[in-house]
Structure formats: structure tokens, C-alpha cells
UniProtKB/Swiss-Prot annotation:
Its main location: cytoplasm. Keywords: Chaperone, Cytoplasm, Protein transport, Translocation, Transport. Homotetramer, a dimer of dimers. One homotetramer interacts with 1 SecA dimer. It is found in: Cytoplasm. InterPro entries: SecB, SecB-like_sf. Pfam families: SecB (PF02556). The gene is secB. This is Protein-export protein SecB. It comes from Anaplasma marginale (strain Florida). One of its GO terms (biological process) is protein tetramerization. Belongs to the SecB family. SUPFAM superfamilies: SecB-like.
């Protein structure tokens, strides 16, 4: 599969999903039910921060294997704060993880890009679903996260940014 890696055409190794799961989940609805009346009069301000990290997992070869497959845990962390007229509507924190392996060996930089660009793209639809269901279950309209450009986020990390992609959503229909 060809792709443009930060302006350079290259090959990205194929990732294999070994598992995915919610590692940490927190939702606070501190000012209910009065906040529901406030939202009907004034749209909430929603701030979203996203962070991606990866870690190598220690794996021992099974019997008969000469070397174990390299496994990596990729964490997609999303923090959301919704405020209406300076009153917190809700706070949401989610760490959603996936365990990945690469189908072939690759140089370290290419592996890093696969883990911090491709892998979070695989996890993101599940993160979006969890957040939409959670906000709806808390009595708010489902919050549908906008698509995230993980390649641009990775490029900003290389440029010395803190690695967080911050979005502001001020639409009244979102939550």
C-alpha cells in the first residue's frame, strides 16, 4: 500500500489488530438535571483534546517459535469538557487501546508512523461510538466526534507541539 508519508512516498507496513478494549472510562454529569434546561436555552461549548501513544509489549516466544511477534499497545486518549454558561455540563475521559502487530519487519521510524498514524485511525470509529453512546446515556444529544487527521497530528508532534490535537465544537446540536 503506497501512501504519502509527510511528503515522502513510502511503504507502510500492514498492521494486524490483535485486540482492542476500553482501558479507562470516566463520565461526570455534575450539574444534572438543571444543566439540561440550560442547554435548551444556550448551546454548550465543547473542548476536546486527543492524544495518541504507543508502547511495546513484552512477549515471550511460544514453544516451537524462534522469536515472538512484536506486539504494541496503542492508546487513543480523548478528554472532553462541555460547559454551558460557565457551568460544567459534563466531563468525559476515555482511554481506548488496541494491541497491534506488524506483518513484516520495518525500520523504527516506519513502525512509529504505523503505530501513531494508522493504528489510531483503526481505533477511532470505536472511540466515536463509545462517546456517542455515553453522552446519549447521560441525557445529552449524542456527541459525534469529527474525523481526526492523525497524520497531521503526528507531524505537529515532530514540529515540537505537545502532541495534543485540540478541537473546539460550539454547535448546539452536538451536546
Amino acid at each position: 500500500m503506497r501512501y504519502c508519508r509527510l511528503g515522502v512516498s513510502s511503504m507502510r507496513p500492514k498492521l494486524k489488530v490483535r485486540g482492542q478494549y476500553i482501558k479507562d472510562l470516566s463520565f461526570e454529569n455534575p450539574n444534572s438535571p438543571k444543566v439540561f434546561l440550560m442547554i435548551s436555552k444556550s448551546p454548550p461549548e465543547i473542548s476536546i483534546s486527543v492524544n495518541v501513544s504507543s508502547a511495546s509489549l513484552p512477549v515471550k516466544p511460544t514453544e516451537g517459535e524462534q522469536a515472538a511477534a512484536d506486539l504494541y499497545e496503542v492508546t487513543l486518549q480523548v478528554n472532553i469538557e462541555s460547559v454551558v454558561e460557565k457551568v460544567p455540563a459534563f466531563l468525559c475521559e476515555l482511554k481506548y487501546c488496541g494491541v497491534f502487530s506488524l506483518e513484516e519487519k520495518a525500520e523504527e521510524q516506519v513502525v512509529k508512523e504505523a503505530l501513531l498514524i494508522t493504528a489510531p485511525g483503526v481505533l477511532f470509529p470505536f472511540v466515536r461510538e463509545v462517546i456517542a453512546k455515553m453522552t446519549a446515556s447521560a441525557g445529552f444529544p449524542p456527541l459525534m466526534l469529527d474525523v481526526i487527521d492523525f497524520e497531521a497530528m503526528y507531524a505537529s508532534q515532530l514540529g515540537g507541539d505537545d502532541g495534543k490535537n485540540k478541537q473546539a465544537n460550539k454547535s448546539g446540536g452536538a451536546a
